[in-house]
Amino acid sequence: MPGFDYKFLEKPKRRLLCPLCGKPMREPVQVSTCGHRFCDTCLQEFLSEGVFKCPEDQLPLDYAKIYPDPELEVQVLGLAIRCIHSEEGCRWSGPLRHLQGHLNTCSFNVVPCPNRCPAKLSRRDLPAHLQHDCPKRRLKCEFCGCDFSGEAYESHEGVCPQESVYCENKCGARMMRRLLAQHATSECPKRTQPCAYCTKEFVYDTIQSHQYQCPRLPVPCPNQCGVGTVAREDLPTHLKDSCSTAFVLCPFKESGCKHRCPKLAMGRHVEESVKPHLAMMCALVSRQRQELQELRRELEELSIGSDGVLIWKIGSYGRRLQEAKAKPNLECFSPAFYTHKYGYKLQVSAFLNGNGSGEGTHLSIYIRVLPGAFDNLLEWPFARRVTFSLLDQSDPGLAKPQHVTETFHPDPNWKNFQKPGTWRGSLDESSLGFGYPKFISHQDIRKRNYVRDDAVFIRASVELPRKILS
């Protein structure tokens, strides 16, 4: 072991310190050839590395020239130190040679339990351990008088058959624990008992009142159908599904049949009423079809924009342009949109390969007025300014977009801007609406980024009206 690592009352003199570990020397030895002193253990560890030279002056060493230094050891053992448990509260101080004698009585020193249990604790905590915690201590049960070790007593405590305890059901009775089981099963008025009809358990003195209300209590069928008894909670299901004498509604009641008869007679009614039932179902299907169409129309109306602006994306532009070249006058239609809430209903159409004077060379764009839900509230003819824009998809951070834009005011004398009627809807020349057959040429549309990712964007905006007719 290296030198002593204790708390000294005064700093040890340098000549008492081991040059290798820097601590007061333990079992000091002296090299007689040079006079240097070291801890015996420190010097042995140094020499075990194969260096046979004095650590201080590097002179050759000979094991035969190394001797114990008892005089120096007496000086070291005479140094005054504090107890190794001083930080824990021990106030002892004295010569180093007396430390072991002090530790044999120090109340802070850790010692093994004298009962040979695994515990190791300070000497001052030993009495409490021996009295309360040691698993090897001896204890006697106050109820049965048996002698136990501490660990065995912990298992015995709380289960001793001779201990007097109260009934766990809180009936107030008190008896020895060994009599508790018999009391709980046959004597206690607060014991639980299962119901004879259901799986639930109840306190013994309330079981009778429950049985009169138990949902599994057998009761006779009120229709006297001959099945004997049925559990009370199953009676509604029995009357609905199983009772042969119960009155039931026709299975075609949802279709409109109001016939009601005993269940046994219902089969005959169904066989004899095939045609009336079929007619009812056909009428029901017709009504449902009308309701479905109305719901679809309402859903379409809800999905239509109502802010006077449409941004229409035409994807797969290259393929659709080739189709338009192969099929003259092939027209693409945008989703419908409203000029405003409760406003005019409009739609934009485009001829990717041109129409009229722009056929084969230009993109043509038109707008038409569609029949709307609020036409009777609006001013006619339609006279709001309309603006078309082919959007430049260039990155705004790199260059200012240059949209292609055209604006017009509808001619109030043109019939397509009059209030739509039921005659509208065909794709002849009169239903094209108004627009620009030469909106942009095929050459110009390929400039910049009007076509990007094989798609073009067309924006249509309408001047918002100030009011609707009152």
From Swiss-Prot:
EC number assigned by the record: 2.3.2.27
GO cellular component, one term: cytoplasm
Modification after translation, per record: Polyubiquitinated, leading to its proteasomal degradation. Ubiquitinated at Lys-263 by the SCF(FBXL2) complex, leading to its degradation by the proteasome.
ZnF RING-type span: 18-58
Topology relative to the membrane: Peripheral membrane protein
GO molecular function: identical protein binding; protein kinase binding; thioesterase binding; transferase activity; tumor necrosis factor receptor binding; ubiquitin protein ligase binding; WW domain binding; zinc ion binding
Pathway(s) annotated for this protein in UniProt: Protein degradation; proteasomal ubiquitin-dependent pathway
Assembly: Homotrimer. Interacts with LTBR/TNFRSF3, NGFR/TNFRSF16, RPS6KB1 and TGFB1I1. Interacts with SMURF1. Interacts (via TRAF domain) with MAP3K4 (via kinase domain). Interacts with NCF1, TICAM1, IRAK1 and TRAF6, and is probably part of a complex containing TRAF4, NCF1, TICAM1, IRAK1 and TRAF6. Interacts (via MATH domain) with GP6 and GP1BB. Interacts with EGFR (via C-terminal region); this interaction promotes the formation of EGFR asymmetric dimers. Interacts with PKM; this interaction promotes PKM kinase activity.
Zinc finger (TRAF-type): 101-154, 155-208, 209-267
Domain text: The coiled coil domain mediates homo- and hetero-oligomerization. The MATH/TRAF domain binds to receptor cytoplasmic domains.
Phosphoserine PTM sites in chain numbering: 426
Outcome reported for the amino acid change (mutating residue 312 to A): Decreased interaction with FBXL2
Keyword Phosphoprotein: yes
UniProt feature coiled coil, ranges: 277-310
Residue ranges constituting the MATH domain according to the UniProt record: 307-462
Annotated knockout phenotype: Mice exhibit considerable phenotypic variability, depending in part on the strain. In one strain pups are born at the expected Mendelian frequency, while in another strain up to one third die during embryogenesis. Mutants that reach adulthood are fertile, but have on average three pups per litter instead of ten in wild-type. Mutants have an apparently normal immune response, with no defects in the development of T and B-lymphocytes, granulocytes, macrophages and dendritic cells. Mutants have respiratory problems, due to developmental defects of the trachea, stem bronchi and rib cage.
Signal peptide as annotated in the record: none
Swiss-Prot/TrEMBL keywords: Apoptosis, Cell junction, Cell membrane, Coiled coil, Cytoplasm, Cytoskeleton, Developmental protein, Immunity, Innate immunity, Isopeptide bond, Membrane, Metal-binding, Nucleus, Phosphoprotein, Repeat, Tight junction, Transferase, Ubl conjugation, Ubl conjugation pathway, Zinc, Zinc-finger
Numbered residues of crosslink Glycyl lysine isopeptide (Lys-Gly) (interchain with G-Cter in ubiquitin): 263
Protein name: TNF receptor-associated factor 4
